[in-house]
Regions:
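Periplasmic binding protein-like
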Residues: 171-218
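Intrinsically disordered, low-complexity segments enriched in serine/proline and basic residues
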Residues: 8, 37-40, 44-50
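Boundary at the C-terminal end of the N-terminal hydrophobic targeting segment
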Residues: 57-61
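Cysteine-centered motifs
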Residues: 27, 50-52
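Extracytoplasmic/peripheral linker and loop segments enriched in polar/acidic and small residues
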Residues: 179-188, 215-276
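A bilobed periplasmic-binding-protein/Venus flytrap-type ligand-binding module shared by bacterial periplasmic
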Residues: 68-93, 106, 230, 238-242
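Short, positively charged and aromatic/hydrophobic N-terminal segments
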Residues: 9-16, 21-23
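Append "and occasionally in soluble cytosolic enzymes with long acidic Gly/Pro-rich linkers
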Residues: 86-168, 257
């Protein structure tokens, strides 16, 4: 189109200088218009690309924010197959020593209960000062026949830091001999399955804030119950909660009863809760 205009412009030059000016003006105006149009098209394309990128990035951000964080509990499992740890007095003594020293964990909130705080129901507190040495002696543990604790945890932070803190606390007793073992996560799983531990680092995470997702593992027949914990009353209550239609008041009452039994049993050694 530009070449045509220049051709017309050149032919008019021989006839009329005024025509030359008119056609030159038309040509310059068109060229300017086309130049601006090209710039606009380029700018519009860039703007469109940036806007689409912004929408895409923003959509991903919204999706990430909308995804609920997993609610997790951080604890140590006892090996209930161990003849000493089967005794509730021994587990109570260990619990008393660890809880009284408030093991630090920067990324978690201290929680010495079975359930995360957001899911807890009111239960009667049976906690009272405990004479640790007396409990151990009642269990037949003496300085000449001490309690041996093989404590397993991962060899990465924060697990190794927490594991060594727990080990130092328990080693303060003359009746306890501690063997802390920091291992790879894969090795931790292997030793858990073999039962080669007295205390082992554990955690449980759920995507939905459901009480039963945290409690089901305490059933003696549950696939995740690898430490040998078994209580007939706990099994009975879990069956009721999972199979019977209950109103809210009855359900809460059964959960309260179940939690009290688990905490009296010292079924686990709870330490923290966190989200990820």
């Amino acid at each position: 189109m530009i070449s045509v205009l220049f051709f017309i412009n050149f032919s008019k030059l021989a006839y009329n200088n005024h025509s030359l000016e008119i056609y030159s003006g038309i040509c310059m105006a068109y060229s300017l218009f086309q130049s601006q149009a090209v710039k606009f098209a380029k700018n519009f394309a860039i703007f469109t690309a940036c806007f689409c990128f912004f929408l895409s990035a923003n959509a991903k951000t919204v999706e990430k924010v909308a995804s609920p964080a997993k609610l997790c509990t951080y604890f140590y499992d006892f090996n209930f197959h161990d003849p000493q740890l089967k005794k509730p007095e021994v587990r109570q003594a260990i619990k008393a020593m660890v809880f009284s020293n408030r093991i630090k964990y920067e990324n978690g909130e201290i929680n010495y209960h079975i359930l995360p705080k957001s899911l807890q129901v009111e239960t009667e507190s049976h906690w009272s000062p405990i004479a640790v040495e007396q409990l151990l002696i009642q269990s037949g543990i003496r300085s000449k026949s001490p309690l041996y604790l093989n404590i397993l945890f991962e060899n990465q932070k924060p697990h190794n830091v927490i594991g060594r803190q727990i080990s130092r606390v328990l080693a303060q007793s003359d009746l306890i001999r501690v063997n802390p073992q920091a291992v790879k996560k894969s090795e931790l799983i292997v030793q858990r399955n073999k039962g080669n531990y007295q205390l082992i680092r554990s955690e449980q995470c759920v995507e939905k804030p459901n009480v039963m997702l945290f409690l089901a593992r305490f059933a003696s027949t549950h696939s995740e119950n690898l430490n040998g914990y078994a209580n007939a009353e706990v099994d009975k209550l879990l069956v009721k909660l999972q199979t019977k239609k209950l109103n809210n008041a009855k359900r809460v009452a059964l959960i309260q009863q179940l939690i009290e039994i688990l905490e009296q049993d010292v079924a686990i050694l709870p330490l923290y809760e966190f989200s990820k």
